[in-house]
Amino acid sequence: MKVVLIIVAAAALAVPVLSRPTTQNSGNVPSTSSSELKSLPPVNLQDFEGKPVQSDGFKGKIVVLDFWATWCVPCIAEVPMLNKLQEKYGDQGVKIIGVTLASGEAKDVKPFIARNKMKYTVLMGDDDQTYDLNVVAFPTTYVLTRDLKVFRRYIGSTPRKAAEMEADIQKLLAAG
């Protein structure tokens, strides 16, 4: 019993550290790490019927790629913000895509999506690719240019994230 309490306490202390918000803008901030993503690598995604979705199919759109998990409270809190961005910018060539990781099988995730009224595309990710995608905490959100270059990466959630992401989208739309 004491071991369980120690593990729970350690996990509670680790969550704020692991989900601390940071942003990186590859357009304005010099690279400080060789592990930093510069563009979206080919990733294995699936729709909820098990059909593969190729990441190169996102080219030509400004993409907000949000990596999340069903058990992640900050991820769930961001759903309304992502819905609003899809609603506001979807017809202007912006695509919001949620990629669920570490959340079980599609049959487990589908009811979660309906319950949380996710109005943007949600795909199943490959948990083994989290390292390749530099997903170190949930949520991790990438704003990608039309040629799938990383414009900005957000780790965690902050009160400013919605406004900053919207400003990113507007900059990319203005750039053409």
Language model regions located:
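Active-site acidic short loop of glycosyltransferases
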Residues: 58-61, 91, 118-119, 135
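Thiol/disulfide oxidoreductase modules built on the thioredoxin-like
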Residues: 111-119, 124-170
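N-terminal "domain-start" segment that seeds a small globular fold
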Residues: 23-56
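Short pre-active-site segment immediately N-terminal to redox-active cysteine/selenocysteine motifs
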Residues: 61-63, 67-71, 137
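Thiol-based oxidoreductase modules, predominantly thioredoxin-like and allied folds used
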Residues: 93-106, 118-127
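Core hydrophobic alpha-helical membrane-spanning segments
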Residues: 5-16
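Conserved redox-active cysteine motifs that mediate thiol-disulfide chemistry
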Residues: 67-84
